Amino acid sequence: MTDKSKESGSGKLLYCSFCGKSQHEVRKLIAGPSVYICDECVDLCNDIIREEIKDVLPKKESEALPTPKQIREHLDDYVIGQDYAKKVLAVAVYNHYKRLRNGDTTSEGVELGKSNILLIGPTGSGKTLLAETLARFLDVPFTMADATTLTEAGYVGEDVENIIQKLLQKCDYDVAKAERGIVYIDEIDKISRKAENPSITRDVSGEGVQQALLKLIEGTVASVPPQGGRKHPQQEFLQVDTSKILFICGGAFAGLDKVIEQRVATGTGIGFGAEVRSKNETKTVGELFTQVEPEDLVKYGLIPEFIGRLPVTTTLTELDEEALIQILCEPKNALTKQYAALFELENAELEFREDALRAIAKKAMERKTGARGLRSILESVLLETMYELPSATDVSKVVIDESVINGESEPLLIYSNADNQAAGAE
C-alpha cells in the first residue's frame, strides 16, 4: 500500500488511509503497518458494526421475563372476560419463553417439552385478539395463517412451510428473531378429517394438512425460501428451527358441543338403573366446551398425533350482553374510543348513551358474531355522520342513543353556534 504522506517543513504530513484527511484535520491519527486511521473513521466503523449486530444480540439477563401475573394484567387491558383462558395462556407463554431463555434441558438433565396451545371458542370470542396482544406485549414477531388455505405438498394451495415464510417476512428475514416468534393458525377445526375412521382416499385439505403440520408444530428445521414456496426452487433456503416458535391454534369447532354432550349424557340407560335428566339441565355451548377431552377432538376429526402436539387446551366462552357492552367501552383500544378519536380530529365530541351501547350489544347477540360484529354495526350507524361531518361547520358534539341504533332517528348534532343549532333542528 502506498503511504499517503507529503513532506512538510518539519517532516512528513500524515493522512488517514480511509478518508484522506490530514493529521491536522482530525483529533487523532492511529498508525498501523504502512496505514493510518483517524478517530472519525474509527467512530464510523463502530457505528456500522453496532447497527449490524444490534438485532441479533441476545437480550440482557437482567431484562426480566414478564411473570404470568404481569402477562394476565396486560391481557386484561385489551381483552374483556375469558379469565380462565387468559390465565392458561399466561402460564403457557411464560413457561415457553422460560424454556427458550434457559435451554431445553435443566441442570438435573430434565428435558423441557414444548407447550403449544389450542384455543376452542365461538366466533368473536377473542381468540385472535388474545394471540395478537400476547405477541405485542412480548415484542416478538407474530403472524397469522388460515388453515383452510393449506394443502399437502404437491397440491394447489399453500404449503405449511409458507407459514414460517410469513413469519420471516414480519421480521425482515431475521432467522434468530423468527425463532422467538408466535404463529397463530386460525380455523384449525376446518382441517378435521371428513370421517372418524382413517380415509383410504386422499384428504389433501383435512387429514393431509394435519399430517403436514405435525412436524412443524412439534419442532423441526424447516427449509424456507425467502421469496415464497414452490415457485422459486432455485433460491437459497433459510433454515428455521420451529421448536423455538410458539404455535397457537384456534377454531370455533361448531358441532363439538354435540360430541361432548353425547359423551357426558347420563340419561341414556334403560330400566330402573337409568338416570332421568330434566330438560332444564341443558348446558350452554360454552359450558360444554369446558368439559372437552382429547377423545372428543378425535371424534370431531382431529388425528390423535395432532392433538398430542397441542398439550395446552383452553376454551373461551360465548360473550353475553354485559361483556359486549364492556368491550365497547373499557379496553384501551375500545371501539367507542377509536371512533371518538376519529371525531376529535374533526373537532367534534362523540357521545354514546347507555341505551345505545345496550342496543348495539343486543344487535351483535342477534347476529351471533360476538365482538366481531360490533364494528360493522357502529360503521353502519355512523356512516352518514362521518360522511357529512367534514363538510359541516360548528358541529361540536354528536350524540348517539338507542333510537339511532335501531334506525328510528338521526344522530343528534350539537352546534357551538346557536343559529346553526336552530337551522340543524329544522
UniProtKB/Swiss-Prot annotation:
GO annotation terms (biological process): cell division; proteolysis involved in protein catabolic process
Record GO cellular component, one term: HslUV protease complex
Nucleotide-binding listed as a keyword: yes
Record keywords, A-Z: ATP-binding, Chaperone, Metal-binding, Nucleotide-binding, Zinc
SMART domains (alphabetical): AAA, ClpB_D2-small, zf-C4_ClpX
Residues involved in Zn(2+) binding: 16, 19, 38, 41
ClpX-type ZB domain sequence ranges: 4-57
Residues that bind ATP: 122-129
Entry superkingdom: Bacteria
SUPFAM superfamilies for this protein: Glucocorticoid receptor-like (DNA-binding domain) (SSF57716), P-loop containing nucleoside triphosphate hydrolases (SSF52540)
GO terms of molecular function: ATP binding; ATP hydrolysis activity; ATP-dependent protein folding chaperone; protein dimerization activity; unfolded protein binding; zinc ion binding
InterPro entries cross-referenced by the UniProt entry: AAA+_ATPase (IPR003593), ATP-dep_Clp_protease_ClpX (IPR050052), ATPase_AAA_core (IPR003959), Clp_ATPase_C (IPR019489), Clp_protease_ATP-bd_su_ClpX (IPR004487), ClpX_bact (IPR046425), P-loop_NTPase (IPR027417), Znf_CppX_C4 (IPR010603)
Sequence similarity: Belongs to the ClpX chaperone family.
Record note on quaternary structure: Component of the ClpX-ClpP complex. Forms a hexameric ring that, in the presence of ATP, binds to fourteen ClpP subunits assembled into a disk-like structure with a central cavity, resembling the structure of eukaryotic proteasomes.
PANTHER family found in the cross-reference section: ATP-DEPENDENT CLP PROTEASE ATP-BINDING SUBUNIT CLPX-LIKE, MITOCHONDRIAL, ATP-DEPENDENT CLP PROTEASE ATP-BINDING SUBUNIT CLPX-LIKE, MITOCHONDRIAL-RELATED
Protein role: ATP-dependent specificity component of the Clp protease. It directs the protease to specific substrates. Can perform chaperone functions in the absence of ClpP.
Protein name: ATP-dependent Clp protease ATP-binding subunit ClpX
Source species of the chain: Vibrio parahaemolyticus serotype O3:K6 (strain RIMD 2210633)
Gene designation per UniProt: clpX
